[in-house]
């Protein structure tokens, strides 16, 4: 099992979590391939972090699963923009911490019905 962590990336955690939920439990090679064709800044960042996690463990991407993919909120950079009549309004520039954990395994993301059957003990 290997991990990769990218901290203080200028990316909204809310938007990044949408992509992170999609790749959790996927094969690493398939996840990287699908992220490359996703037109989103978060997809580019997550693709690099997944590739880094695979490289950190000296693993083969074809036989590696993404065990967990977590995006936490980092500090918010506060900026101001001038407005009419001498006022200024705040601009929030959020940052994120991206954490990816991968492990050897060949099982793909299982379906909801399969998970339900496992929970019931069938």
UniProtKB/Swiss-Prot annotation:
GO biological process: translation
Superkingdom of the source species: Bacteria
Cross-referenced CDD domains: Ribosomal_L22
InterPro entries hit by this protein: Ribosomal_uL22 (IPR001063), Ribosomal_uL22_bac/chlpt-type (IPR005727), Ribosomal_uL22_bac/org-type (IPR047867), Ribosomal_uL22_CS (IPR018260), Ribosomal_uL22_sf (IPR036394)
Coiled coil stretches, renumbered: none
Pfam family of the protein (one): Ribosomal_L22
UniProt-annotated stretches for the region Disordered: 102-122
One GO CC term on file: cytosolic large ribosomal subunit
Entry-linked PANTHER family: CHLOROPLAST 50S RIBOSOMAL PROTEIN L22-RELATED, LARGE RIBOSOMAL SUBUNIT PROTEIN UL22M
Record function comment: This protein binds specifically to 23S rRNA; its binding is stimulated by other ribosomal proteins, e.g. L4, L17, and L20. It is important during the early stages of 50S assembly. It makes multiple contacts with different domains of the 23S rRNA in the assembled 50S subunit and ribosome.
Name this polypeptide is given: Large ribosomal subunit protein uL22
Organism: Helicobacter pylori (strain G27)
Lineage: Bacteria, Pseudomonadati, Campylobacterota, Epsilonproteobacteria, Campylobacterales
């Amino acid at each position: 099992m290997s991990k990769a962590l990218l901290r203080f990336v200028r990316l909204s955690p809310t938007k990044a979590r949408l992509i992170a939920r999609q790749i959790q439990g996927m094969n690493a090679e398939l996840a990287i391939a699908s992220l490359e064709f996703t037109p989103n800044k978060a997809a580019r960042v997550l693709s690099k972090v997944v590739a880094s996690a695979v490289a950190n463990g000296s693993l083969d991407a074809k036989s590696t699963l993404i065990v967990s993919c977590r995006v936490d909120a980092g500090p918010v950079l506060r900026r101001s923009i001038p407005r009419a009549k001498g006022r200024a309004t705040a601009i929030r520039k959020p940052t994120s911490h991206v954490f990816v954990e991968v492990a050897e395994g060949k099982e793909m993301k299982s379906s909801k019905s399969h998970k339900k059957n496992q929970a019931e003990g069938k």
